[in-house]
Amino acid sequence: MSYLVTIIAFIIVFGVLVTVHEYGHMFFAKRAGIMCPEFAIGMGPKIFSFRKNETLYTIRLLPVGGYVRMAGDGLEEPPVEPGMNVKIKLNEENEITHIILDDHHKFQQIEAIEVKKCDFKDDLFIEGITAYDNERHHFKIARKSFFVENGSLVQIAPRDRQFAHKKPWPKFLTLFAGPLFNFILALVLFIGLAYYQGTPTSTVEQVADKYPAQQAGLQKGDKIVQIGKYKISEFDDVDKALDKVKDNKTTVKFERDGKTKSVELTPKKTEKKLTKVSSETKYVLGFQPASEHTLFKPIVFGFKSFLIGSTYIFTAVVGMLASIFTGGFSFDMLNGPVGIYHNVDSVVKAGIISLIGYTALLSVNLGIMNLIPIPALDGGRILFVIYEAIFRKPVNKKAETTIIAIGAIFMVVIMILVTWNDIRRYFL
């Protein structure tokens, strides 16, 4: 049963993170007028799909990513060229609405035509010889029109609906929006957790065994007001004061039953592992703070949690990249789907709150990792847009596509190595 719970939790976490990321791309793409033929969650064979307006929404078998396919985001060419024989369906204005490439269709009242000239990007027309009168005709293509092959519809994308032909700013927004939406999701989750759990105060809720707070006699309900020379008004002040006092003997003042008392104690030094490549030294008294539920403090606390988590993850990612050049790199620094599954298994056992917190951190991590300037990632593609903005011309399309393909192969190889390393670490 625990495996089933972990699998369900993993699928939900993965689905939420990828859906939010890809929706960010699609949201800004559509705002810029870019046609998005497909929105996919997962990779590999399609297991479910539905069409809404011009976009086909699909869920695919392998939980290793997702994508938004945008018109003009590659070297794909229209499947029709002069010399081909196709069938066309016309509307009441005598405009082409469907170009049928085979006999696997259910359309009626269609015309067969041998294509002599055609343009699917700018002038939108087909000129050719029709079978019914063996005469040459010129047909305009409707703005909303489709290629039909094997029963599937692919909407024709004029040049002004293609990603490649947009200005740098909408391109940048479209590419950056994926990571941006991951950051927004993380922030919302952190704030939501703060509202649910309340924000910590400087009042003691519970003391830990064999820690300085217990040894000094602190009790539930004691409100800490000063540590050394540092005044305390909220829980963050406790952490800040202890960072300065470190593990030196100090005086702690607290209020109990309306009276101010003081004790001397020595904070305990602890090491908290944040990621595979970074840890944090903290000095603690060893007490769990009481929480309060207010209207605005959770927003501030959520922002703080987001900034702290983002800083730690950014530092870890920079450290990992630096280790590639300094010789300290290890695949243990990375987690693939198998490693994330293992982490989810551990977090699920701690409860739904821990799972939500882990999802928030994972969302930040996904956003930051996608901004690494590797051609197949959002960060690498943003570099191409920056080049276009600076030099007032886009990177050669063939060169860009080749570089992105090399980057994609590199990422696939890395993913395979990371996955094998995760399997070896956790299951062998």
Curated annotation (Swiss-Prot):
The chain crosses the membrane at residues 172-194, 309-331, 352-374, 401-420. Zn(2+) binds at residues 21, 25. It comes from Staphylococcus aureus (strain COL). Its main location: membrane. Its cofactor is Zn(2+). This is Putative zinc metalloprotease SACOL1281. Belongs to the peptidase M50B family. Its EC number is 3.4.24.-. PANTHER family: MEMBRANE METALLOPROTEASE ARASP2, CHLOROPLASTIC-RELATED (PTHR42837:SF2), REGULATOR OF SIGMA-E PROTEASE RSEP (PTHR42837).
